[in-house]
Structure formats: C-alpha cells, structure tokens
C-alpha cells in the first residue's frame, strides 16, 4: 500500500466470515483517525492501523464469527478541522460505526462533539486531555489508556515525594499541553511543592534552546516537559546537548513518554527517565506474545501504549457489537460498559459512567545501556499504580453523566 494512500486516503481492510443479520448495513466499519506523518506518528500512525487489524482478526476467531468488519484509516494532520471533516465524511458517506485512536487532544475534542451530535462510537487511546471525561464527556465516547492526570499522578507525584519540590514547565501550546501542565501542577502542590513558572512552545517545534534556557534560569529543581511525541524527543535531546537538567540541583522530567520516544532517543540519552506508562510489551507472557505478533506486522517495532490501546478498544467495541447483536451506538455503548475488558493489553480494567477506562498503570524507568539485554529492552517497572489510584476520581468530575 502506497504511503499517500495511507496518509491522505482511506485504507480499507475487509475481513469477513459472512454477513451478520443484525448489523444495519451488513458490515461493521471502524475508522482509525490518527497522525500518519507528524510528531505523533511513531506512537500511533501505521502501528495503530496494524493494531486494529489484529483486533479484527482476533475477534473474528472468537466473539465475532460470522461478522463482516472493515477498517478505514486516514491522517488528520493534527488539525481539528481536518479531523472533523474526515469523521463527518466517514459517518455520512461511508457509514462508519466507530472511530478510534484520535491522537491529539484538539482533534479528539472536535470528533467527540461530532460523534455526540451525529451518533457513532468514539474511542480515544491517543489524546491526553481530561476534558473528554469531564465537561466534554459523551455517552458514546470512551477514553482508553492514559490522560494528563494519570501521567501527572505517576511522574510528578513520584518526584515530588522524593523531595523535588520546585517545578518549571515547558509546555506545548494547545489543549493537551495546558491540561498536562494543570494536572501536574495540581499534583505538585498537593504534595507540598511549588510551581515557579512556565513557558509555552508551538506544536512540532524544532528549536527548544530559548525555552530550556528560560527554564534553567528559573532555578527550579525540576524542569517538567508538558509535551509529547517528537516535541518531547527534541526537547530532551537539546537539553542533554546543553547539559540542562542533568546536574544535582536541577533535573529534567518528561510527563508523557512513549516507548517510541525512548527508541528515538536511544538509551544513552534517555537512561534514567522515570514516567508512567499504561502498557509495556515485556510486562508478562500475554504482553510479550501480543508484541511478538505486532512487531512482525509493524517493521520490527514494538507497540506503544497508544497502539496497544487501539487494539484493546477496537476489540472491546467489536465484541460488544457481537454481544448486542446490533451496531446502534446507544445499544453498543451500553454493552461496552457492561462487558469486562479482557485482552492481552489491559490489567484490572473497567469503564466508568463518565467514559474513562480505568486500569493499572506502571511507574517505569529507562534502563542504562548496560542493563539492556537487546533490542527494545528499554524499561524496568518500578511499581504498579492501581486502577483506582491512577486516574482522577469522579467525585469532582464535571461530566453530566455522573450522578452526584
């Protein structure tokens, strides 16, 4: 398949074992709307399409026997208007039933509103904003894997409790970055720390030197990177180059790191980073078996938590359609909340009324080159953050689906 088709068109994969009588148009269609060419493409992108295909294959062998399922994919170019336009086209012209991945918080919020108004299931494994399960929650929107609170609760809480009390943030200037900075700031303050300042940078920035120098000049004990993907990689590389945040009086903390980021940085540069992750391929036998299948289809790359989340969300959606014997979004959304989430990716997982999927998270640390035993052996799990502690509780939620 040509890259232009993957990037701007719709990649269709139809896997069928005959039609399913209860499906409205005879086929269940899932769209993977992701970043195929920008700063988040390594953590999602083509790998998210691969993960969705694996979910289809697995469900057809089990709960989905006899169903016809089609996967579509497109590049949203990290633009909310393009994402909304493609999602609307899928819903109106292609009769897509569900959309997954949706990396980029601005993209996710635009599609959440559209799907809420027009119907259809939205499954978010790539964006981080907590607005998806608060003021912008939807009865047919589900937030998988992580959010800004889970990342702050893991990284910021761990470092603050170790005595790293004063923080300065380098923040990407859009909804995701603002949310990540706010949640991390709240966690720091709740644990007795202070925030001395912040500076914001554009998405996909190439030069972080001025932002990092400002952060260094703050004399804060921790420079917190409230960004993700290629921005995180670039910021860490440039910080190491200028020896910023590498001394005993000031350290660098990345609040959202993916396995693909560690791979891009290399262990020599990334070693010692501590962060929260929702999936690690070498965690147990199930995750290792899943990763082995995935890498064979994804040019040897192990899955990130975004890609693992696409697999889990698409599989759970499909088996919910099968159990409901319907692709009606209201019926399927209810069934998704009823059924347990059991797959090779998630541990101790369930869906709350606000659409937040809660599950165990892991506090991990990047290994040194000497500790690594081979390709992609990058992380060691320091501790498990239980599902009921990893995510913000609903008692302060701004979601109108939550009864108080």
Annotate each predicted stretch with a short phrase.
Residues 1-29, 398-404:
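Short, low-complexity disordered leader/linker segments with a strong preference
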Residues 23, 27, 42, 46-48, ...:
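Beta-alpha junction/loop-to-helix N-cap segments that form part of ligand/metal-binding clefts
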Residues 24-53, 74-81, 103-104, 170-178, ...:
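Extracytoplasmic "Venus flytrap"
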Residues 28, 340, 344-404:
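Solvent-exposed, acidic/polar segments of extracytosolic/periplasmic ligand-binding ectodomains
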Residues 90, 94-103, 123-125, 168-171, ...:
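Periplasmic-binding protein-like
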Residues 236-312, 321-327, 370, 377-403:
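Extracellular/periplasmic periplasmic-binding protein-like sensory domains
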